Amino acid sequence: MAESFNFELVSPERLLVSEKVTEVVIPATEGEMTVMANHAPTMTTIKPGVVAVKTAAGKTERYAVFGGFADILPSGCTLLAESAVHVDELDPTVLENRIEAARAELEGAGDEKKTRLEQFIAELTKLGEIVIPA
């Protein structure tokens, strides 16, 4: 059995998860990252995507996150999300509204901001394809 560690998923609205887990897969900006017990200390940024949490009991839960930071230590991992929700609670209209708001910001945006917004829109679109049934 895999060793467990402490994991917390926190958004400004609430604490979504605080428990012992055996594995967490996070959507880091450098690519998906699997965190397990005794992981090397790391701090990374999170892009919009799905966080998969495997509990010590063996159950896997999935959460949609919309950016943030992860602080990883050998004894645990804390993910501070800009916004997060369990995938079962994700409202497709909320996701579509975020995409539309980002598209509206594109008008008049400078080159650097435009590039970041286009990337954000692509990440939100991919998130929608992953968690919202067709």
Swiss-Prot record:
Membrane topology per record: Peripheral membrane protein
Domain of life of the organism encoding this protein: Bacteria
MF GO annotations: ATP binding; proton-transporting ATP synthase activity, rotational mechanism
GO cellular component: plasma membrane; proton-transporting ATP synthase complex
Key words of the record: ATP synthesis, Cell inner membrane, Cell membrane, CF(1), Hydrogen ion transport, Ion transport, Membrane, Transport
A Pfam family this chain is assigned to: ATP-synt_DE_N
Family matches, as CDD domains: F1-ATPase_delta (cd12152)
Main location per the UniProt record: membrane
Locations listed in the record: Cell inner membrane
InterPro entries given in the database record: ATP_synth_F1_dsu/esu, ATP_synth_F1_dsu/esu_N, ATPsynth_dsu/esu_N
Subunit structure: F-type ATPases have 2 components, CF(1) - the catalytic core - and CF(0) - the membrane proton channel. CF(1) has five subunits: alpha(3), beta(3), gamma(1), delta(1), epsilon(1). CF(0) has three main subunits: a, b and c.
Family (UniProt): Belongs to the ATPase epsilon chain family.
Function: Produces ATP from ADP in the presence of a proton gradient across the membrane.
The protein, known as: ATP synthase epsilon chain
Species: Rhizobium meliloti (strain 1021)
